[in-house]
Amino acid sequence: MAVIKTLSERERIGQKIASMRQEAGLSQAQLGERCGLERFHISRIESGRHSVGLDTLAAIARAMGKTLDFV
């Protein structure tokens, strides 16, 4: 499984996820529930403090009705 490693990539992707989540009117807890993650995990991903694997990224995208090309 590929993992995003550089801080700038993590931050950029996290900001994109946060923006999409807010546009969808979802809380971090709601998004987490939809994709099988805890709220704190969503928070760490959005803030760029956690590397996100492709499987997790795909689950987040699906939970918001998106595909991975949003990245």
Give the location of each predicted region.
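Short amphipathic helical patch at the helix-1/turn junction of helix-turn-helix
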Residues: 11, 22-23, 51
